[in-house]
Amino acid sequence: MTRYLCAPDSFKESLTAMQAAEAMARGIENADRDAEIRCLPMADGGEGTVRALVDATGGTMHAVPVHDPLGRLIEGRFGVLADGATAVVETAEASGLARLNAEERNPLIASSYGTGELLLAAARLGVRRIIVGLGGSATNDAGAGLLQSLGVRLLDANGDELGRGGAALADVSVIDITTMDPAIGNVSIIAACDVTNPLTGPTGASAVFGPQKGAGADDVVTLDAALAHFARLIESRFGVDVSDVPGAGAAGGIGAALKGFFGAEFRSGVDIVIEQSGLDEAVRWADVVFTGEGAIDAQTGFGKAPAGVAGAAKRYGKPVVAVAGCVGVGIDGLHGLGIDAVFGIARSEERRVG
């Protein structure tokens, strides 16, 4: 009897990671009636991480009312893992670019307020740690909205509360944390982040990610200056320089807020998922490992879930088959990561790598 592990990431806009794993399992069963199969959904810290970790650990999903990037009330979801001590939040859930249509995208006013509401809801459940998946945000406010939703007061020179959005940070003069909800102080925060962009400068949040969120050339200059001003204020208030921290520019600068205010630990998203899901034990059990995601190409080797799965399998000498919606260029280098064959299901294509 052959033992198979099905450990794919989601196929974006088509299948969740668990649905993809179950589809793989059905195919294996059709070919090998005696197969023993385990499904273990994976993710890389981006969109789909909450669902993958909840499914992998037998945790629970929670829905709460939150605000989208433009302040409209929506339903937001976060997960609590089976240990009851770990919650998982994605910035894309409440503050994501997918929440807005193309005409609504405006990082000058978009706010991360809803992500803070998810953090607070999780903290009030009594968890000890919160994993925050950074990515896919519509915001460029350095996490200011997130902080405001937690009770932090950001005031201008007249003592008035700042408006929401990245542009408003140009006017912040005072950071008051005395009104911050005490529940958030009882948790440690782990930032799942696979980009190393700093908060400001030519490789910062505004310059690199601002345009895809709707920022024009002048907006990028405005936002970068506003975030730099906020960073200087954080440094003077807390003694932490967040402007050049690798990953501080993730999710429109939310990484900077998590680091500066909560001392968040930054870790690779796929490493977190591997650890929390128990992938190593599952790989040791298996004879053959299947993984995959929507597209597999040269970028798969840079922090993507299939590469993480293959790395674990390689440590234990297990063969790996990757399945993708489509197969791009540059996959020959994946053999060194432990992927032995790639199947592109869109065109029923098989590619051996190496």
For each predicted feature, which ranges?
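Glycine-rich nucleotide/cofactor/substrate-binding loop typically near the N-terminus or early
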Residues: 23-99, 169, 190-199, 205-206
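Anion-binding (especially nucleotide phosphate/pyrophosphate-binding) glycine-rich loop
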Residues: 73-139
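Carboxylate- and glycine-rich phosphate/diphosphate-binding segment that chelates Mg2+/Mn2+
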Residues: 92, 103, 160, 189-252
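Glycine/threonine-rich beta-strand-loop-alpha-helix active-site module
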Residues: 110-113, 117-120, 124-133, 138-188
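Glycine-rich phosphate-binding loop
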Residues: 134, 261-269, 277-316
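Oxyanion-binding "anion nests"
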Residues: 223-289
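Catalytic phosphate/nucleotide-handling subdomain of diverse soluble enzymes
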Residues: 285, 301-344, 349
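Conserved small/polar residues in nucleotide/adenosyl-binding loops
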Residues: 350-354
